[in-house]
Amino acid sequence: MFENLRCAVLWSLGYRYSFWHRLAGLKDARLRAEQVMEDIGLARRRDTPAGILSYAEQRALEIGITIASGADVILLDEPTAGMSNTETEEAVAMIRRVTEGKTLVMVEHDMGVVFGLADRISVLVYGQIIATDVPAAIRSNAAVQKAYLGTSLNHD
């Protein structure tokens, strides 16, 4: 698992199949990969092959690879799909932690995940944006409630 992260860090530092590279950069890459492992909660699984990580751990590793690459904009598609409630809560906390100061664009149907992560939400129904606002306003938006619940909770 460590090698997956180290490769992402090396790539972000410009090490692309180059035979001639600075050895000092390799130490920096190792330290950065170890920091990302800690950030995504997988430090204890450092030497575990990625293929035998649990599903939730594999998703965390995918996010870690993105973070290790130095991306300022992170795009996640259903990051918690298929996870248990506990795994989802842990994933949301980890995503919040590692995307702080970055732009996060996410497609997600689990509204608990959306409200747990978003500063701003756009609601898409049949390909049309029906609302864009802060989470509290989206939660009370009659059009959003009708689209997702079949009726408005506002009873207007």
Regions found by a protein language model. Give the residues of each.
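Glycine-rich phosphate-binding loops of nucleotide-dependent enzymes
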Residues: 1-156
